[in-house]
Amino acid sequence: MSESVRTNTSIWSKGMLSVIVAQFLSAFGDNALLFATLALLKAQFYPDWSQPVLQMVFVGAYILFAPFVGQIADSFAKGRVMMVANGLKLAGAAGICLGINPFVGYTLVGIGAAAYSPAKYGILGELTTGDKLVKANGLMEASTIAAILLGSVAGGVLADWHVIAALVACALAYAGAVAANLFIPKLVAARPGQSWRLSAMTRSFFSACVVLWRNGETRFSLVGTGLFWGAGVTLRFLLVLWVPVALGITDNATPTYLNAMVAVGIVVGAGAAAKLVTLETVSRCMPAGILIGVVVAIFSLQHALLPAYALLLLIGMLGGFFVVPLNALLQERGKKSVGAGNAIAVQNLGENSAMLLMLGLYSLAVLVGVPAVAIGIGFGVLFALAIAALWIWQRRQASY
């Protein structure tokens, strides 16, 4: 690794900008592909409950590969790991375009995403340090949410025009991400020379889980981010079901517009968190987490587009302010104890286990016929109570 790469820790360095561009294109593809594939399922007359199952196979890949992807991220240059992972996403999207079963293709994309995540967040701690890491996380989240905004809308709008065209656009986005990864500096592997025996890797991963869980700060971060992303992915699918019921709109584009409002809000909230919250004042984000659940419950009762847009914007702002400091806290503390790649892999296991549980409960509620509005209200109330309980628990732990 060159000396310039070692010393340039600016969040506007060439390496950081390359990471952000690659992340934008990869996240654009992820979000466009979700809505394009949902449109494909609708066009092929799959039942409503199968929609969250699509995300569950994606999440299942994260959980299955969780013991291995952190070590992969720490054993090789993270930029190259990101490139290979985006190549897997490209293969999955291209496969769906060519007619393979959408659940199979989406699973392949999930495997790529599982390998990609520890590398994309772990590399931030190698390109910058300290409180700049909070700002770098804010920049990463802003880039991601901008991609969610544009990707979700593009996926829905293109799918209303032509489903295959939407799928091709996703494949092209992944191809662009692969190209952008080539411009990321080749950093020295964080932890080379580890054992590649599956039993040793599994033991190492679960040892990292134990280390992070026993630390009060990282445990707090793991639970908070798990609850947030589990709720976030469930809200996405709830919107697809809620829009026709509450608003009487049946196209593919409207749920993507509503999801985009959440994305805009998260950009604002992430920026506010970068300015107002440090690693020493992370608990400032907790009231925002409680308010997310309250606003979701209020949102579920709406029957007009304008207040729905406004409330989803507010949900996004609260979400960005809540999750960015928790991510930065885990990366900083995890880098020092188990390595950034392993820390993010453990975080992914927690987040995706929460997603799988929440999506499973949501699918069950849809299958047994619970109305969409009732699901939304119950979901919001339970989320607010869960974050309040986490905050109380964290304060008690800190007082010991």
From Swiss-Prot:
Q: Give TM segment ranges.
A: 19-39, 53-73, 91-111, 139-159, 164-184, 195-213, 227-247, 257-277, 281-301, 304-324, 352-372, 373-393
The main location is membrane
Q: How does it sit in the membrane?
A: Multi-pass membrane protein
List keywords of the entry alphabetically: Cell inner membrane, Cell membrane, Lipid transport, Membrane, Transmembrane, Transmembrane helix, Transport
Q: Which Gene3D superfamilies match?
A: MFS general substrate transporter like domains (1.20.1250.20)
| UniProt-recorded Gene Ontology molecular function terms | lysophospholipid:sodium symporter activity
Question: What is one GO cellular-component annotation here?
Answer: plasma membrane
Is DNA-binding there in the keyword field?
no
- Tell where it localizes: Cell inner membrane
- Pfam families named in the record: MFS_1
Q: State the InterPro entries in the record.
A: LysoPLipid__transptr_LplT, MFS, MFS_trans_sf
Functional summary from the UniProt entry: Catalyzes the facilitated diffusion of 2-acyl-glycero-3-phosphoethanolamine (2-acyl-GPE) into the cell.
Q: Which HAMAP family match?
A: MFS_LplT
NCBIfam families in alphabetical order: PRK11195.1
- Which family does this protein fall into? Belongs to the major facilitator superfamily. LplT (TC 2.A.1.42) family.
Q: What is this protein called?
A: Lysophospholipid transporter LplT
Upper lineage is:
Bacteria, Pseudomonadati, Pseudomonadota, Gammaproteobacteria, Enterobacterales
* Name of the encoding gene: lplT
